[in-house]
Amino acid sequence: MSQQETHGFQTEVKQLLHLMIHSLYSNKEIFLRELVSNAADAADKLRYEALTNDALYEGDGELRVRISADKEKGTVTIEDNGIGMTRDGVIEHLGTIAKSGTAEFFKNMSGDESKDSQLIGQFGVGFYSSFIVADRVTVRTRAAGHSADEAVLWESAGEGDFTVETITKQSRGTEITLHLRDDEKEFADDYRLRSIITKYSDHISVPVEMYEEGTPAVEATEEGGEAIPATEGHWKLMNKATALWTRNKSDVSDEEYQEFYKYISHDFTDPLLWSHNRVEGKQEYTSLLYIPAKAPWDMWNRDRKHGLKLFVQRVFVMDDAEQFMPSYLRFVQGLIDSNDLPLNVSREILQDNKVTTALRTAVTKRVLGMLEKLAKNDAEKYQSFWTEFGQVLKEGPAEDFANKERVAGLLRFASTHTGEATANVSLADYVERMKEGQSKIYFIVADSYEAAANSPHLELLRKKGIEVLLMSERIDEWLINHLTEFDGKKLHSVTRGDLELGELEDASEKEAQEKLETESEGLVKRVKDSLGDKVSAVKVTTRLTDTPACVVAGEGEMSTQMIKLMQAAGQDVPESKPTFELNPEHPLVARLNDEQDEQRFAQWSELLLQQALLSEKGSLADPSAFIKLMNQMLLASVK
C-alpha cells in the first residue's frame, strides 16, 4: 500500500458539488441512475476493448452491475466488473470536470432552484451526484489488464479535497460506497432501493443485480403448516438485461422509452418525442432517436460534443458519433446499432465510409419526418420545439442541400399577418395566403421584431394587404442567403433593390408612379447633387406612403444586417453606398422641393438621409453631427 496523497478538487468541481447539494434535493434519487449508468458504461467499454484483447476479461466475461446496502452502517455500494480505472485515471476523472464551456455553464446559474436543477441535469452530474445523499464516498477500483496491487482507493467528503492511495484489489472493476447522510438513510432500505433500481435500470443491457438476504428454515407446525427450507443469500437480477432498442416497439412502454432517454442523455425531463425504427434488407440497423424538450445549455458552444451513441451488432463502440447526424440536428439524442460496420470501426473510418453516409441520410430523413409529423398533428407541441431549437434548424438550408425544401417547410417566422412576435407562420402558410398575381414571398430582416414590424419599407405592402415575414434573429440573414425560394416562389427582401410588385400593381398605379417620377426628376437631381457620393443613387420610392424617405441596398449588395454580422465577426466589409428613396407626396419632401436656398436645401437633404439611415441601421456613424444639424433646423423653423 502506497502513502496516501491528498489532492484539491478543481474549482469547477467545488462549485458543482455545492450547487448539486442545494439544487437537486428534490431529485436526489438520480444519484443511483448516474452511478448505475457509469457502471454500465464501464462494462460496455471493457466489452469493446476485449474485442482486440480477450485477456482483459481475466476469465470473467460475465459483465454485471451489483448494488447492495447495509442498513446498520448506512451505506450503499455500487460495484461493476467493467474497465476500471488506473491511479491517473482516478485523479483525472474524479477530481476534475473535463468539459469545454464549463465556465459558461456556471455563469448561466440563476439562483432559481428549479431552473438551476434543470441546468445541472443538462450539464450531466455523473459521479458527483453521490454527494447529494452521501457525506463521504469511497471508491475502490482496478483497471482491466493491471495487477491486483495496482488498485486505487479514492475517498472524499465532497468538500475541498480528496485522498488517493494504491491498494490491493483482486477483482477487476470499480466499487463505490456511499456513506449516507443522517437524513438520507432511507436509501439503505432494500425496498426503496429496489423501486429506484427497477425504475432506472430496466432498459440497461448489462445485468443489474441486488443482493437478497437468505431466510432461515421454518419447521412444520402441528396445525398443518408446511416446513419451509432455508434459503441462501444470493444476487438477484433486477432488470431485463436486454438492450431496449432490440425489443419490439410493442413491448416497450412510454415510461421505458422516457427513462432510457434520461439514461443516455442525463436529462431530468422527459423527451418531446422519439422514434424507434428497425431496418432490414440491403442495410440492417436499428435507430432510437429522441427530440429533447429543452435545448442544452451549451448548444451554441462550437466545441460541444454531439452525435449518437454507436453500437455495432449490439456492442457499444463510441459516444458522440457526430458522423450520423448533420450539425443542424445536433440536439438529437439517441443511438444507432448497425450490422454493417466493422466492430473495430474508428472515427477516422466513419468519416469516409459508404455505410456511414447511407445511415446518415436515413436517420436525417427520419428526424425530419418526425418533425413534419409533429408540426402537422400538434401545432402547440411543435411551437414548443421551435422555441427551443428553431435557430439551430435555420442552419439546415445552408448545410443540407438535399433536404433544403423539407427543412424550409419546418421553419417558422413572425409575420404581419398575425401581428405578434411569436414565430408561428410557415412558408407553406404564407404561400397559401398569397394574393392573386403575387409571385414572391416578401420578407424583412431587422435587429428586433419591433424594428421589422415598424419599418417604413412595409408601408405600401401593408396598405395593399400583402403579408411580409418579419425576421429578427442573427442567423436570419445567413438563412435567406441560402434559402432563395420555396415551392417555386422567390424570397424577396423589401429592403433591397426594387419592390417588384408585378401583377399586384394595376395599370393606373403604374401610370401614376411614372407620372410622379417624371415630375420629380428635378428634385431627384438636386438631392443627388447635394448628397454627392454619400449615396449611390436617388430615386422616387415605390414602397413608402407615410414616411418621407428611406434607404435600400442595391440588388447585388450586402444588406445592412449582413454588414453588421460581418463587422461583429471582425471581418472587412467592402464599402457600399445605399440608394436613397424619396416620397414626393410627403409634406417634408414637398417642402424640400420648394426650398430655393441651396444651403437650406442641402441641410434638409442631409437631415432626411440621416433619418432614413437611423431608421434602417438603428445607429449613426456620427450621431453628434446629426443632433447638431437637427437643432439648427429646429432653431431656424421657430425664428
Swiss-Prot record:
**In terms of one coarse class, where is the protein primarily found?**
cytoplasm
* Spans annotated as A: 1-347
- Name a GO molecular-function annotation: ATP binding
Do you know which Pfam families this protein is assigned to?
HATPase_c_3, HSP90
Q: Report whether Acyltransferase shows up as a keyword of the record.
A: no
* GO CC entries: cytoplasm
Keyword line: ATP-binding, Chaperone, Cytoplasm, Nucleotide-binding, Stress response
Location in the cell: Cytoplasm
Region span, C:
565-639
Region listing for B, in residue ranges: 348-564
Q: What does this protein do?
A: Molecular chaperone. Has ATPase activity.
NCBIfam families named in the record: PRK05218.1
What protein family does this chain belong to?
Belongs to the heat shock protein 90 family.
Question: What's the subunit arrangement here?
Answer: Homodimer.
Provide the protein name: Chaperone protein HtpG
Recorded source organism is: Shewanella halifaxensis (strain HAW-EB4)
Q: What is the lineage of its organism?
A: Bacteria, Pseudomonadati, Pseudomonadota, Gammaproteobacteria, Alteromonadales
- Name of the gene encoding the protein in the UniProt record: htpG
